[in-house]
Swiss-Prot record:
InterPro entries: NAD(P)H_OxRDtase_bac/plastid, NADH_UbQ/plastoQ_OxRdtase_su3, NDAH_ubi_oxred_su3_sf. It is a multi-pass membrane protein. Its main location: membrane. NDH-1 is composed of 14 different subunits. Subunits NuoA, H, J, K, L, M, N constitute the membrane sector of the complex. The gene is nuoA. Belongs to the complex I subunit 3 family. This is NADH-quinone oxidoreductase subunit A. It is an enzyme of class 7 (translocase). GO terms for cellular component: NADH dehydrogenase complex; plasma membrane. GO terms for molecular function: NADH dehydrogenase (ubiquinone) activity; NADH:ubiquinone reductase (non-electrogenic) activity; quinone binding.
Length: 122
């Protein structure tokens, strides 16, 4: 019986090693085989075929990052809600209560952000 489990873990280990080794080997071979002729034209920023007319490093206001984090949080919520909604009829009442607790926790966080006026644009 133990050999079945060992065999399963061996398959996972092989896939993990292949998943790490294949990209590393491909990138290493590409770096070794490609021609290396650096020039000033290759080092410039490409902007729609014309020379860039200002610096590419633009500072964004910190509020953009807060909105991005809130978006990621609710995007991950969607990732959790979709499989639950697909398998809802098989999961039962316990899964419904768990998902309601999860959604309520996110809504409490959203209400807190709203109260602290994080959602106001500049």
């Amino acid at each position: 019986m133990a050999s079945v489990y060992e065999n399963s873990y061996m398959i996972v280990l092989i896939f993990l090693l292949l998943g790490i080794l294949l990209p590393v080997v491909a990138l290493t071979l590409g770096r070794m085989l490609r021609p290396n002729k650096p020039s000033a034209a290759k080092a410039t920023t490409y902007e729609s075929g014309i020379e860039p007319f200002h610096d590419a490093n633009i500072r964004f206001h910190a509020r953009y990052y807060i909105f991005a984090l809130l978006f990621v949080i609710f995007d991950v919520e969607t990732l959790f809600l979709y499989p639950w909604a697909v398998a809802y009829d098989k999961l039962g009442l316990f899964a419904l209560i768990e998902m309601l607790i999860f959604v309520v926790m996110l809504l409490v966080g959203l209400a807190y952000a709203w109260k602290k006026k994080v959602l106001q644009w500049l």
